[in-house]
Regions:
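Extracellular and organelle-lumenal recognition/adhesion modules and their flexible linkers in secreted
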Residues: 1-229, 241, 246-250, 261-274
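Conserved radical SAM core fold
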Residues: 254-256
Length: 278
C-alpha cells in the first residue's frame, strides 16, 4: 500500500474479528518461529501502551532459533538503499541483556542486510539500527537471539529511508510520486465507507490515528484487514502539504455504511471537529 512499512503485523494486534472470525488472522499472523528449544508467545500483562496491548515474548533455551516475518508477500529491497529498523524491547526479571541479530534473507538463504542491537532495559525502550541492502532482492526478516534467555518485543518496524520527500514514518516514494504527478487539486481521506465503518465501535476515530505510533489505536475495517493507523491524519495532511493539494478530511456522520451495523445498531456518534488552523 501507500504506507511504507515493510513488516506485517508489526504490533501483534491482528485479531480474528478483523476477518469475520478467521482464527489464522491473529497476533502471530505473518510471524513464524523456526528452530528447536525455543518458544514464541503473546502476552498482554504489561504492554508498551494500553492502546497496543499485545506483545511478543521470545524465549531461547539453545541458540539457533529465529523469529521470521515475511512482510507483505515479501520484503523487496533496492540495492544500496538503507532501511531503518526499530522495535520496543524489554528484558523480563530473571534474564540478562541479550544481543539480537537482525537479518534480511533472500530465497537462496543469502544475507542481503544485517545489523544487531542489544536489548538490556528492564522497562520498555526503543532500539534502532540501520540495514543496507547488498543487492535488489525479495527477502524476509529474521531475528535471532545470540544467547540463552528471554526478551519481550513490540512495534517491530522496517522502513526504507527513501520515502516520499524523505519523511519519517512516510509514504512509498514510487506510489506517492505517482499521485503527485497527477497534480490533484485536493485529496480526500481516509475514505467514505472506511470512515463510517460497520457500527459505532468501528467508526474511524481520527484522534486514534495521531501521536506516537505505539499509542495509536488499531482497528479492523470493512475491507477485511487490519488498520495499524501508522498512516493517520497527520501523515495525510503532511502529504497534502508536500504535493500542494487541498486536504479534504472525512468525519463520520454517525450512520454506518450501507446499513451494515452489527446487530442492527445504527446509532452513531459525533466526533469533535478538527481545528483547521492546527
Amino acid at each position: 500500500g501507500l504506507y511504507a512499512e515493510l513488516i506485517q503485523n508489526r504490533d501483534f494486534e491482528y485479531d480474528p474479528s478483523d476477518r469475520e472470525g478467521d482464527k489464522n488472522w491473529n497476533s502471530t499472523h505473518s510471524w513464524k518461529l523456526e528452530g528447536d528449544n525455543a518458544t514464541f508467545t503473546i502476552n498482554t500483562s504489561d504492554p508498551v501502551h494500553p492502546n497496543n496491548p499485545h506483545y511478543a515474548v521470545l524465549n531461547i533455551q539453545q541458540p539457533g532459533a529465529v523469529l521470521t516475518n515475511a512482510g507483505f508477500d515479501g520484503i523487496a529491497l533496492q540495492a544500496g538503499e538503507k532501511y531503518d529498523f526499530s522495535l520496543f524491547g524489554r528484558i523480563p526479571a530473571g534474564h540478562k541483556s541479550n544481543k539480537l541479530q537482525v537479518r534480511l534473507i533472500d530465497s537462496n538463504g543469502t544475507v542481503q542486510g544485517e545489523a544487531s542491537i542489544t536489548v538490556s532495559s528492564r522497562s520498555w525502550k526503543t532500539y534502532k539500527t540501520v540495514l543496507t541492502a547488498k543487492t535488489a532482492a525479495d527477502t524476509h526478516l529474521e531475528l535471532q537471539l545470540q544467547s540463552v534467555g528471554e526478551v519481550e518485543l513490540d512495534m517491530i518496524s522496517l522502513f526504507p529511508q527513501n520515502t516520499f520527500k524523505g519523511r519519517k514514518n512516510g509514504l512509498r516514494a514510487d506510489l506517492a510520486q505517482t499521485l503527485a504527478d497527477i497534480h490533484p487539486r485536493f485529496v480526500r481521506f481516509p475514505g467514505g465507507c472506511v470512515a463510517h465503518g460497520d457500527g459505532l465501535k468501528n467508526i474511524y476515530q481520527w484522534k486514534n490515528t495521531i501521536g506516537p505510533l505505539e499509542a495509536r489505536k488499531s482497528a479492523r475495517n470493512l475491507w477485511g484487514y487490519h488498520q495499524s493507523m501508522g498512516l493517520g491524519y497527520y501523515e495525510y495532511f503532511q502529504f497534502c502539504e508536500d504535493i500542494g493539494a487541498e486536504p479534504l478530511p472525512v468525519l463520520a456522520a454517525g450512520v454506518p455504511c450501507q446499513n451494515s451495523a452489527c446487530h442492527g445498531d445504527l446509532r452513531g456518534g459525533q466526533q469533535g471537529g478538527i481545528p483547521m488552523s492546527e
